[in-house]
Regions:
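Outer-membrane beta-barrel proteins
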Residues: 2-175
Length: 175
């Protein structure tokens, strides 16, 4: 919980000084390959600087078995028409701790009063002895509840070595 609080404060201070967004989300994660179910807490933040979209994500998952796992990712991308391809780096603080690369793409569209975002990302390269392969498809609908505050509804599905389904809610703040 302390890590989540620190990550939230860092993200809020970054977002407040640079403009952009911060969201705090909680997902119920179900393993599809006999693994352990978990609850994942996310702090996400982002901004745009000189046409480059910068983002970050801290994910802390508590499994039913009592384990606590955390990862942190930073990404950079640039809009190409309706899509935003991105690259990034991540660090998994799991059992052995390792670094990995990311590539992905997102697209956002106003739908009704809110905004729908869909995307996919995959790990590339890793300092892990036996690299864990993971591709994640994700979707979020941000429904405005105040001028700069939204309610987020999230869904994702992981493929390859990590096979999970996740559904959750969160709150987003724009600056």
């Amino acid at each position: 919980m302390k890590k989540l609080l620190v990550a939230t404060l860092v993200a809020l201070s970054f977002g407040a000084s640079a403009g952009g967004y911060v969201s705090v989300d909680v997902d119920n994660v179900s393993a599809r390959n006999g693994g352990t179910d978990s609850v994942a807490q996310y702090v996400r933040f982002g901004t745009e600087v000189a046409g480059v979209q910068l983002g970050g994500q801290s994910r802390t998952a508590r499994s039913n078995g009592g384990g606590l796992f955390n990862s942190f990712e930073l990404t950079a991308g640039s809009a190409l028409g309706p899509v935003n391809p991105f690259v990034g780096i991540g660090h998994d603080n799991g059992n052995n701790g390792y670094n990995y690369g990311l590539v992905g793409v997102t697209a956002a569209q106003k739908v009704g009063p809110g905004v729908a975002l869909v995307g996919v990302k995959t790990r590339v390269g890793s300092t892990e002895t036996t690299p864990t392969k993971q591709t994640v498809g994700f979707a979020t609908y941000a429904y405005p509840i105040l001028k700069n505050v939204s309610l987020n509804v999230n869904a994702s599905r992981s493929y390859q070595d990590i096979k999970e389904n996740a559904f959750g809610l969160g709150v987003g703040f724009s600056f």
